[in-house]
């Protein structure tokens, strides 16, 4: 997949999300505005955005929404589809999929063959990092989103660095700058 194409697509997603936010009047204090595109052969086949309920404790991350919408559209197909996932944040900072989203993706491996996960990362020259899904799935220290950290803090005390070293069973129990320089996005 052409690297410049991915960078352009991420810029388009960022602008699209900013337009949605502006039209809705939504004000975010956390810069947590993400968009996701599910790609088949480099072509977007499903989109998702982060959704937060202001009156309750319901969130749906962009990755989960895009995959859910794709599952709904495909219905009960038995054919396994090869896909890549692109996740971007409107402010261009890190958008690595969290533990809950990785677990959700893993639960769908019977329907999808997820190859690469592309996400915005400030430390990459191109602004995008590419990681094989299998590597992301097997990481010992997965990212935990702010919402889940707050739930853990509420019910299990203050999450500190030792939280990340908890057993995988505990971790799995958690409910499931846009001006980029053109350079190569390499998968780790």
For each feature predicted by the language model, list its residue ranges:
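Zinc-dependent deaminase catalytic domain
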Residues: 1-188
């Amino acid at each position: 997949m052409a690297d410049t194409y991915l960078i352009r697509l991420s810029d388009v997603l960022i602008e699209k999300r900013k337009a949605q936010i502006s039209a809705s009047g939504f004000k975010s204090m956390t810069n947590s505005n993400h968009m996701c595109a599910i790609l088949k052969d480099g072509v977007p086949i499903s989109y998702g955005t982060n959704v937060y309920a202001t009156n309750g404790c319901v969130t749906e991350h962009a990755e989960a929404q895009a995959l859910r919408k794709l599952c709904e559209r495909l219905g009960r197909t038995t054919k396994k589809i090869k896909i890549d996932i692109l996740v971007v944040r409107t402010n261009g900072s890190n958008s690595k999929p969290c533990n809950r989203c990785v677990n959700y993706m893993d639960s769908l491996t019977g329907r999808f063959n997820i190859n690469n996960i592309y996400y915005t990362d400030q430390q990459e020259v191109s602004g995008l990092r590419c990681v094989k899904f299998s590597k992301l799935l097997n990481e010992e220290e997965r990212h935990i989103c702010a919402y889940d950290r707050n739930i853990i803090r509420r019910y299990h005390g203050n999450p500190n660095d030792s939280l990340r070293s908890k057993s995988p069973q505990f971790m799995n129990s958690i409910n499931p700058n846009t001006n980029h320089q053109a350079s190569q996005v390499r998968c780790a």
